[in-house]
């Protein structure tokens, strides 16, 4: 029997888990299962998190020792932004996850969710001098949201890096961690997930284009107009605030094909 199949629902063992927290756990567990399907895992590395609704300094994170495909709503660990583990975590948590996520939640009360990946495409572009280039529509719609953070070594070895990560993310929602990977931060789990999907696609397109002949750049007018559209994407007045339409579709797909996350 898998580790995830042995997990008892937290609703049965912890009466302090509110309905709002349970829904947040379902969202985050779904993100992990979907991430596994998209190949976003890196052994036991990479981590997604979601702020506990109604709190200022608590968030949910994956426990150390489970693959993305094994994560369930009940297996998620509750943390606070000071690095304290507030729920059971038999194997602990990924220290780098606490450094990266905790610092952003402490500095950005508007952020509800954070995702961090080491994908080949994202890490590859993070190692390029010019970073993500304005050479595809996928990249252009993200440009106004992107920031960069210089590589300092493993995040788990530098607790004070959390402040510099938050500083470099600033008011952005996409952070390229140089020579390391990518990070997205959004107002909902859906927005954070969909932004990461768009970052991944933009990076894949860039690497594919660079592998061929000379890269063609759009006109400056086309660049400016597309960036303006992207800056408003998923805003409160958009067709899909917080990427709600996309996320609902992802959740329906997972409920059909892999409902085991919801325990």
Model-identified regions with their sequence ranges:
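Glycine-rich flexible loops
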Residues: 1-263
């Amino acid at each position: 029997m898998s580790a995830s199949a042995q997990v008892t629902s937290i609703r049965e063992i912890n009466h302090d888990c509110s309905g709002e927290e349970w829904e947040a756990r379902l969202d985050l567990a779904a993100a992990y299962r979907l991430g596994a399907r998209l190949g976003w895992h890196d052994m036991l590395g990479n981590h997604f998190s979601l702020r506990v609704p109604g709190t200022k300094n608590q968030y949910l994170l994956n426990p150390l020792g489970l693959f993305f495909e094994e994560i369930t709503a009940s297996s998620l660990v509750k943390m606070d932004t000071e690095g304290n583990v507030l729920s059971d975590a038999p194997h602990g948590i990924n220290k780098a996850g606490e450094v990266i996520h905790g610092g952003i939640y402490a500095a950005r009360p508007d952020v509800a969710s954070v995702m961090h990946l080491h994908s080949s495409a994202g890490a590859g572009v993070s190692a390029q001098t010019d970073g993500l280039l304005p050479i595809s529509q996928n990249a252009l719609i993200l440009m106004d949201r992107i920031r960069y953070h210089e590589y300092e070594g493993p995040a788990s070895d530098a607790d004070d890096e959390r402040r510099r990560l938050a500083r470099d993310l600033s008011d952005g929602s996409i952070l390229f961690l140089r020579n390391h990977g990518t990070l997205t931060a959004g107002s909902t789990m859906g927005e954070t997930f969909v932004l990461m999907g768009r970052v991944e696609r933009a990076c894949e397109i860039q690497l594919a284009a660079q592998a061929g002949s000379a890269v063609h750049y759009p006109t400056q007018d086309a660049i400016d107009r597309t960036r303006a559209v992207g800056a408003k994407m998923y805003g409160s007045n958009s067709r899909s605030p917080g990427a709600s339409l996309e996320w609902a579709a992802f959740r329906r797909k997972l409920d059909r094909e892999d409902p085991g996350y919801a325990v």
